[in-house]
Amino acid sequence: MKSLHWFLHLLIIAFTVLRSVEAQNQAGFISLDCGLVPKETTYTEKSTNITYKSDVDYIDSGLVGKINDAYKTQFQQQVWAVRSFPVGQRNCYNVNLTANNKYLIRGTFVYGNYDGLNQFPSFDLHIGPNKWSSVKILGVTNTSMHEIIHVVPQDSLEVCLVKTGPTTPFISSLEVRPLNNESYLTQSGSLMLFARVYFPSSSSSFIRYDEDIHDRVWNSFTDDETVWISTDLPIDTSNSYDMPQSVMKTAAVPKNASEPWLLWWTLDENTAQSYVYMHFAEVQNLTANETREFNITYNGGLRWFSYLRPPNLSISTIFNPRAVSSSNGIFNFTFAMTGNSTLPPLLNALEIYTVVDILQLETNKDEVSAMMNIKETYGLSKKISWQGDPCAPQLYRWEGLNCSYPDSEGSRIISLNLNGSELTGSITSDISKLTLLTVLDLSNNDLSGDIPTFFAEMKSLKLINLSGNPNLNLTAIPDSLQQRVNSKSLTLILGENLTLTPKKESKKVPMVAIAASVAGVFALLVILAIFFVIKRKNVKAHKSPGPPPLVTPGIVKSETRSSNPSIITRERKITYPEVLKMTNNFERVLGKGGFGTVYHGNLDGAEVAVKMLSHSSAQGYKEFKAEVELLLRVHHRHLVGLVGYCDDGDNLALIYEYMANGDLRENMSGKRGGNVLTWENRMQIAVEAAQGLEYLHNGCRPPMVHRDVKTTNILLNERCGAKLADFGLSRSFPIDGECHVSTVVAGTPGYLDPEYYRTNWLSEKSDVYSFGVVLLEIVTNQPVIDKTRERPHINDWVGFMLTKGDIKSIVDPKLMGDYDTNGAWKIVELALACVNPSSNRRPTMAHVVMELNDCVALENARRQGSEEMYSMGSVDYSLSSTSDFAPGAR
């Protein structure tokens, strides 16, 4: 056994070495020494082995300089030079990256009296069109480091320095590092670093590349009230954060083990929203009678994570799935031993970020690309304002451009004025990519060649001014362009006194126009007469008894779409263009299924989930009708609510309330990267899902059978409240008489009632069977069907394991024993009753809800007894702003 233990550690060492070797090539790194000259110069910084190069290929403006020689020995080489921007309000670096990927972007600023003025600058940093941070230099040798984790929406990124006062913006270095997309998850916005610390066992400065393959800068933290523990053995750091070995091999624990440990900090902005990432690994070899288990709460007892046991020599990363805030900017985190613990809490590393809201959308990417090409083609880099995003923000729009700013999509260019811009050569085809352009002024330049035909294809274009270009061929106007002029949809100015006009038509045209006008007046009178007749009839109709119901009860039987008025409810019907707007052209995918794809949306300021029917779905429209019919007439706090629906031509969509925490299966498996669901969470989710299902059976008239109950159809909101979803297969059954309905079998393998499958007779007990399978998943966190098991189906596997009389052998090991044993037995027995092969011997959902409430009560009693064991004293230390941690010394 001992040899196996060491063999596993050797594997971890080998993996770590491979990752280290792989990291040496700095793949994806962009490391710019700003102001470095000449252009060809590159070098490797000795203390980090990072290769830096000049920034000249990434920016068109600025002056180069160097910090005072007296200060150079205090800093790494990449901050010896600076690039400053005395001209222009906004100056931007343009970096080519991979769209929709996550990057760490870091700007470093060391003044070093480079200009001899001894004036400490202050200015703003922008990421694309959005403000990132404010830079305030506090001293000649103070290092100001600003870092953000950002998902780039396009294949290029602008990092801009914006002048906000009398002083001149400058930058020393700009670094971009790729990250795993699965790391640092947020609901929205980007992450600006506040602090990133680790707890070394000996005095140390900071850690970065090549110990950290992503070149994150880890600052050491020491405190009089804390002691440090460490290990020489390797740590398994194989999660999406790729934590450095040197960071995870050490940890801090409070000196006074009997008292809770208080960790606090104050954000620079009181109302800032924050994400906190804590990294844990057990670095001590615990004996059989030693246990390290603790709870984490924050800001007065709000639960962060319960019953945490750091895994032995293996990483566990805990973070909040949504942003948290504090009214005064102060955050207090308390780490307290549980009653089962013999050892104090530990913490290996901590990262704190504030949210940068990305509210300003970037200009349409095709138009940005076109403008960059136009800028390069005509050598327009000398235009001071032509930096960063062409349109956004509006305050810094490029000179000569006018833009439109739609609410839900990126800005668009609607006019381009390059009058007198010293343009030479032919008219570039990149102009044709500005598809919403209405006005184009290329006058008073030295353009040559023919007038391009693509002008005629630009449907939005209303005015073109080509005057003052003596070498432009104005004699050959393309026929298609002449037709646009003839139709008066376009004005073409060719010279100072020459505007291309429509070719003259026959003299009969005025008579035709007069006749058309008379006919138009007559038609208008006829329409008005018809309108008043219809209006009078409508008034009479409204005096009759109340209107017919908007929704026909029961199941819609017809499969012909044109004959289904029963699902048309004007108050909730949404058009396809509205769907496009609310989803931002289907930008963010939440999930995919047999029905189609589910997208994130925003309707009237509220988040929604938009499920689009796939055109390839054979039974999709039938299920669509069934789900609309059901959801328009049922309302329950534990059923996902229907906000609206779209039935617009071939486009079908269901718009639901948004469930921020995804489905139960994702949360059980850990795919969402959040905390392990506690036993208390699981019991509450089971009760709430059962209540929703019980309502369908007993609260609806006629009663409903869901037919597809499974963990992926139980959705969780931001508070982990459960709601039953996906009613596309639901069926009603009679109130009186027979309690079964004969129907074609439908459902999901593994959850499907075998009696229903065998007989085609559907009843509410079919849902009870499926829910029993869900309960077994909740308890065991095992797949429903696993062919590698001796008994593949979860029902059979649990029954077999229970013959040994040990409930612990089937309960999810991620719970680490943190559950009420009596409650676990009770819920497993209930689940096995639900999956009885005979439907007559299964309980009703009303009985299931009652039994589950008993399980919740048992768990609550256990929790209250455990929490009384917490000590009330505290040990605390604080974290200050990231500026105090900035690494500058070599």
Curated annotation (Swiss-Prot):
Domain Protein kinase: 584-856
Topology feature Extracellular, residues: 24-513
LRR repeat placement: 412-435, 436-458, 460-481
Localization terms from the record: Membrane
UniProt keyword annotations, A-Z: ATP-binding, Glycoprotein, Kinase, Leucine-rich repeat, Membrane, Nucleotide-binding, Phosphoprotein, Receptor, Repeat, Serine/threonine-protein kinase, Signal, Transferase, Transmembrane, Transmembrane helix
InterPro entries named in the record: Kinase-like_dom_sf, Leu-rich_rpt, LRR_dom_sf, Malectin-like_Carb-bd_dom, Prot_kinase_dom, Protein_kinase_ATP_BS, Ser-Thr/Tyr_kinase_cat_dom, Ser/Thr_kinase_AS
Transmembrane intervals: 514-534
EC code: 2.7.11.1
Phosphoserine carried by residues: 742
Residue numbers of Phosphothreonine PTMs: 575, 743, 748
Top-level EC class as recorded in UniProt: transferase
CC per GO annotation: membrane
Annotated glycosylation sites: 49, 96, 142, 181, 256, 285, 289, 295, 312, 332, 340, 402, 419, 465, 473, 497
Top-level lineage group: Eukaryota
SUPFAM superfamilies tied to this protein: L domain-like, Protein kinase-like (PK-like)
Catalytic residues (UniProt): 708
Any GO MF annotation of the entry: protein serine kinase activity
Binding site for ATP: 590-598, 611
Signal peptide: 1-23
Cytoplasmic face residues: 535-890
Family, similarity comment: Belongs to the protein kinase superfamily. Ser/Thr protein kinase family.
Protein name as catalogued: Probable LRR receptor-like serine/threonine-protein kinase At1g51860
Natural source organism: Arabidopsis thaliana
